Design a protein with these regions (language model features):
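Generic recognition of stable, solvent-exposed alpha-helical segments in well-folded globular domains
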Residues: 1, 5-8, 12, 54, ...
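Short, hinge-like loop/turn segments at secondary-structure boundaries
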Residues: 91-94, 169-173
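Single conserved hydrophobic/aromatic residue that forms the stacking wall/gate
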Residues: 175-178, 182-183
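Thiamine diphosphate
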Residues: 83-161
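Active-site-proximal loop->helix
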Residues: 142, 163-171
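Residue-level signal for well-ordered alpha-helical positions
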Residues: 13-16, 88, 147, 166-167
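Glycine-rich, acidic loop regions that bind phosphate or pyrophosphate groups
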Residues: 1-32
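Active-site diphosphate/adenylate-binding microenvironment
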Residues: 34-117
Length: 183
């Protein structure tokens, strides 16, 4: 084991690596990633919006372009919209995309967005939500209003718990399937 002060140990390791002339071997890996992205894109350009149809991937791309990358925070609720937001909203700074990850904590996003707005009052805060997850804590709109917190909320309404449908469909749990959540 290496025992020592982290700053000194890392400086020593970096110096030894530089003296040895070691170079990262990332070129083949980056080429592989580029090939995968070409073959298996997140987004198919043939998905076109038309009257009566909204393509969630396009919504996220448009939102991403509207946000100031240096002075905005995106917080997600939990569901399919969370995946689209993670894939299509560009962020330049750390801690400007807040999500509960894979924890499945529906209702996390809006209160977290309110907290982010309190923590960074000069930044624009947007909560990306689905109709199912937003209803878990929609009462927090009162908290935001009472405290004058200017959080914006984008709700994608598919009238269902979309991710529940998505994962029940492959195993044919038709009798257990989540149905409409909002009128």
């Amino acid at each position: 084991p290496i025992v020592g002060d982290l700053r000194g140990v890392l400086a020593g390791i970096n110096e030894a690596v530089a003296k040895a002339g070691a170079k990262p071997i990332t070129a083949p890996w980056l080429a592989q990633i580029a090939e995968w992205r070409r073959r298996f894109p997140f987004y198919h350009s043939d998905l076109v919006e038309d009257p009566g149809r909204i393509v969630p991937e396009t919504v996220m791309q448009k939102l991403s372009r509207k946000l100031d990358p240096k002075h905005s925070i995106v917080v997600t609720e939990v569901g399919q919209h969370q995946m689209w937001a993670a894939q299509f909203i560009d962020r330049e700074k750390p801690r400007t995309f807040i999500s509960s990850g894979g924890l499945g904590t529906m209702g996390f996003g809006f209160p977290a967005a309110i907290g982010a707005a309190f923590g960074r009052p000069d930044d624009q805060v947007v909560c990306v939500a689905g109709d199912g997850s937003f209803q878990m804590n929609s009462q927090e709109m009162a908290t935001a209003a009472i405290n004058g917190v200017p959080v914006k909320v984008l709700i994608l309404d598919n009238r269902a718990l979309g991710m529940v449908h998505q994962w029940q469909k492959p195993v044919s749990y038709t009798h257990l399937r989540a149905h409409e959540t909002c009128a």
